[in-house]
Amino acid sequence: MAKEKRVKGEWKRLTVQAAAFLLQNPKLHNFFLGTIDTGKTKVLCAPGLNCYSCPAAAGACPIGSLQSALTPRKPSFPFYVLGFLLLFGVLFGRWICSHVCPFGLVQDLVYKIPFPKKVRTFKGDRILRLLKYAVLLVLVIALPLFDTLKPYFYKYLCPSGTLFGAIPLTLTNPMLRGQIGFLFWWKVGVLVTLLLLSLLIARPFCRYLCPLGAIYGLFNRFALLGLTCDASTCEIGRASCRERV
């Protein structure tokens, strides 16, 4: 009975995740055209790590918007982006990560592939989780403040941008294929590594590297929509949680 409830709950979550993906990326035909939508809604942020360069995207990524606002070339205090993150953080916390983020959905689907050994936790797991705060402070905030031309997180690390933006655009746009170089293959390597790790570990990018998850995590304890665990009365949820919350 417990297993049936768990499976049913997982399918419900996958349904919400799929719906969230379509809401954030409604212009699917652009995948075949090799173009980026530039409609009026692109000035608005999506709640998840949804790449602006994704051909189907109807909005902007909040991390990308934050980086753009911090560049010295056109410095401005990111009132809108910070207000957006504050609002969604207070309302939902990391529920956004588990139910709305497109790359979170991809990792969940990969984790469902049968594999001989799934890793729930390991020595050093808690320390590695601090990496995402370093990514936020260094790659997203500090470095863009001193370099006008390099959005470091997206240029060197972001797997969501590679999967939903760079790869589809390169496949459908001959001009871009002619410009493929080391940086493209570096980001493909990062993406492949994270997807392979997703066979073993639930959401490795979310756990260890995602700066948006780091921001939402700051609100998790007092978000209106969140998860609580009373260890004094029940250990079932803690034992079965893939994320080891």
Description of each model-found segment:
Residues 1-244:
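Non-ligating segments of multi-cofactor redox enzymes
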